[in-house]
Regions:
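Surface-exposed loop/turn motifs in large extracellular/passenger domains
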Residues: 28-227, 231-277, 281-378
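Gram-negative bacterial Sec-dependent N-terminal signal peptides
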Residues: 1-26
Length: 378
């Protein structure tokens, strides 16, 4: 009898130790950065988690994170960090300044992060102590050997903040997937909404690995610098459902809706740029990627740059049902509606094409055929 009681106490103690290992105090950062040694490690949080603090990385001199997982090697053994229910990260403490890049969620070397539930909510308004440094606020970051799986129905990322004592010199990126295909850097999500108000450079989604998502909504305003809605340097192509990008650059004109070096496919794309110069840009030095929009492609650009283009594809440019392009380039030298570098670039929109181009020199189409029926060119 005494032996059975002792065994129960031992089992209960082990269970409590495991629960403590995988629990988090309200607001505390979660850091699973370590040398993994000789085996994989797994951490799981079954309840909803809310975090409002970040900690500086013990392995990277330039990083501070609210949620982080990764190792320094360990012969390739992995760390896996899972959240079964809603995860909320809210970094908005004006007294917590840092000179590091700040990551709300960061998957480092050999790390897998799984996020479930209904909502992943991220606010990164971290304050930077060095106004002359090019530090960045990140929503989600994945390294070259990481995997990020977001099964939550919705992911919302809000970016802001500034340098301590100054309203300038900081940058923000919603999602940075820095992977190498067939090696790592896999990112999977459902519905993504990214918003931002900033003074410096902005990228909604920056991908060089394998990236998959359903619907994407990116809306941001910046005082100066450069802005991209989506910047894709991965070679595996992108395939989305509905994409909406609305960006405003108050000073300057280095503003692009989507730039991709591989095939881009979507059901519908809507791009609205204030002081932008390129709506869609699909090109690569080694190949001729295609742009395929199955439904409607809507582009609205007001620009003060020397030239502007609504949509450009080095390969085929295909629009399935409806094409609307409006470009106010009254301060520009050249205004281009849609452009394809090959003679059989085509739009299937046919009877549902409307282009309004304003500028001293306008080119509605270049090497793009299929404009018939009720096409309206003004």
């Amino acid at each position: 009898m005494r032996k059975q009681k002792l065994e129960r106490v031992v089992v209960l103690s082990l269970m409590l130790a495991a629960l403590q290992q995988n629990s988090v105090l309200a607001g505390d950062a979660i850091s699973k950065e370590e040398y993994t040694g000789d085996k994989d490690k797994y951490y799981s949080y079954q309840d909803a988690v809310s975090i409002d603090k970040f900690v500086e990385s013990q392995f990277s001199y330039k990083a501070a994170s609210a949620v982080s997982a990764g190792s320094t090697g360990g012969n390739g053994f992995r760390i896996e960090l899972s959240f079964d229910k809603n995860l909320t990260v809210d970094l908005d403490d004006p007294t917590a300044a840092t000179d590091k890049d700040v990551y709300a969620v960061r998957a480092g070397n050999y790390a897998t992060i799984n996020i479930g539930g209904e909502l992943l909510s991220i606010t990164n308004n971290a304050i930077h102590s060095d106004p002359n440094d090019y530090t960045v606020n990140y929503g989600i970051y994945g390294s070259q050997t990481s995997k990020i799986n977001i099964t939550a129905q919705n992911t919302e990322i809000n970016l802001g903040g500034n340098s301590q004592g100054k309203d300038e010199t900081y940058n923000a990126t919603g999602i940075y997937n820095a992977g190498i295909e067939n090696y790592g850097g896999d990112f999977l999500a459902k519905n993504l909404k990214i918003t931002g108000m900033m003074q410096g450079n902005f990228i909604g989604i920056n991908n060089s690995g394998k990236f998959a998502a359903d619907n994407i909504d990116i809306q941001a305003v910046s005082e100066s610098g450069s802005m991209y809605g989506i910047k894709n340097t991965g070679t595996g192509g992108l395939d989305f459902k509905d994409v909406n990008i609305e960006l405003e650059l108050k000073s300057g004109y280095a503003l692009t809706g989507i730039k991709s070096k591989s095939n881009l496919t979507a059901d519908n794309i809507n791009i609205k740029l204030q002081n932008g110069n390129t709506g869609l840009y699909v090109t690569d030095t080694a190949s001729a990627p295609d742009l395929l929009v199955k439904g409607a492609l809507n582009i609205d650009i007001v620009t003060n740059s020397e030239s502007a283009v609504g949509a450009y594809a080095k390969g085929k440019l295909t629009v399935g049902k409806e094409l609307n392009v409006f470009i106010d380039g009254s301060k520009s030298f050249n205004v281009n509606g849609i452009v394809s570098d090959i003679d059989d670039g085509i739009t299937d929109a046919k009877d549902n094409v409307k282009m309004v181009l304003i500028g001293p020199r306008v080119f509605y189409t270049t090497y793009v055929v299929g404009f018939t029926g009720n096409t309206l060119l003004e």
